[in-house]
Swiss-Prot record:
Naturally occurring in which organism (per UniProt): Clostridium botulinum (strain Eklund 17B / Type B)
One Pfam assignment: Amidohydro_1
Domain of life: Bacteria
EC number, UniProt record: 3.5.4.2
Keyword Manganese on entry: yes
Keyword DNA repair among UniProt keywords: no
Keywords: Hydrolase, Manganese
TM spans (from-to): none
Species classification: Bacteria, Bacillati, Bacillota, Clostridia, Eubacteriales
PANTHER family, A to Z: ADENINE DEAMINASE, N-ACETYLGLUCOSAMINE-6-PHOSPHATE DEACETYLASE
Name the UniProt record assigns to this protein: Adenine deaminase
Gene: ade
Catalytic activity: adenine + H2O + H(+) = hypoxanthine + NH4(+)
Swiss-Prot/TrEMBL cofactor(s): Mn(2+)
GO terms classed as biological process: adenine catabolic process
UniProt family annotation: Belongs to the metallo-dependent hydrolases superfamily. Adenine deaminase family.
Amino acid sequence: MKIDMNLLKRRIKVANKEVKADTVVKNGKILNVFTGDIMRGDIAIVDGFIAGIGQYEGEQIIYAQNKVIVPGFIDGHMHIESTMLTPNELSKVLIQHGVTTVMADPHEIGNVAGIDGINFMLNASEELPIDVFIMLPSCVPATSFENSGAKLDAEDLQPFYTHPRVLGLAEFMDFSSIVNLNEKMLQKIINANLNGSIVDGHAPGLSKEELNVYISTGIYADHECANVREAKERLELGMYLMIREGTAAKELKKLIKVVTPTNSRRCMLVTDDKLPDDLIVEGSVDHNVRLAIKEGLDPVTAIQMVTINAAEFFGLRSFGAIAPGYQADLLILDELQNVSIDKVLKKGICVVDNGEIKKEEFKINDNSKELAMKLPKINMKELEKNAFKIPLSSDLCNVIEIVPNSLITYHRVEKVDIDKGNFSVSIANDQLKMAVIERHHATGNIGLGIVKGFGIKNGAIATTVAHDSHNIVVVGTSDEEMFLAVNHLKKMNGGIAIASGKEIIASLPLAIGGLISENGYLEVQQQLKILNQALSIIGVNADFNPFLTLSFLTLPVIPEIKLTDTGLFEFKTFSHIGVQA
């Protein structure tokens, strides 16, 4: 909210007790995130902002009943598209978990639809009961070694910096463009700097020497640390550390030990990519806070990491604290240790009471379906009969091995079965066939590879959620089932499909860009439940999420080996390699 003279005068009068506040929250224990202390006092709210803490009278009184009051939670790095929900539907889920503000990077929809994709996300996230700030996608496409739906140069992004909810440039992931002095990419960093905006990072696997080069450009945060050493190095060199706990990438338990009383204010908790069923049941960064506390972190420190730390990094001076002049985003907790949420106040209005949405305060007109009319449809070349054949002259091959609950893969060289000069799937060795089909420009590109770790016994899984270019990715035990799953995606204009034998046994349509559902969050949750149940039919019994794991096997900017529509890609050499070793 922009403040004007009348609003400022009114706030001053309430603070000075000349007029009553709109709302006063009484009888609570207030967590001061600046000092770490618990304070007593009334919280006086006017026009959505805190006017003062002390003894106040208001038109409306909310009694906290001696419960703990903390600032609304901030997720400092996430992708709305990964939730498969429209911003409107996502806000209904997040607000119940105390998340009142998110920093969203729309690089998924940006890779599919370019400028139209960013505009869709900005327009669809207007006037929600949470604040959605946008970090502009920095690398569309992620690399030049694949085909995305769009390309975004510095001049394409420049106009967006004037938007009040655009805060900066998101996860700059193309390290090679920095070290090779690629002026087109460097201009994006310069433009962000000239606009007084932030640049955050994405730098897995860099040595300390490479990290110096990376940070010298003005990139000051990273969420891609794979181990304690990398986390410490980033903190030592002045970066903010974003500790990630999502659906596929679960790094909090191993990285939280890095957080100390002296460095904790440089640390945040984020989700990055989390599926809707996990968000609904488990939670967002509220879950991360609970997990951090369970791992031994001081509760106050954990709360700071999703409030004031994030707000200060992103330059949101009126967010992340309970103090005069700050936005009245408040959580009333039954218990601090378990982060059990009783009430949520957004800009001073109680939108969640007793853990349930107050529907009368939650009036939202979801226009996402109409806004999505401008977005492109699936445009793939018809598959030929032998499209998934992998010809081999030797049985020694480069194999992608998935790492459960991680985005990293292992590069293995293994002996494989050959039948009539082509790779033959081995259920016994868990060596399955994988393909990435270009779906934006009907180029006919198909990248082929071998993957292990899914444990599929009979069937195929296909999806249009394939980071970051979001082509179609499919894995399976037979070409016929892979064909069936891919063609079903085309009929739905995107989504997830599981094939077994000659039929589709479960699917989830994602008609908005092949990434987002048009349905409500409870319906999407039910569809995902059916998909998960169908996994057992094709023999999958995994302790990780196969759908999101498959979606990240196509991201070449994460080690060690991935598959794009142009072929197998090795991170170490940052180049293509053949299937045959």
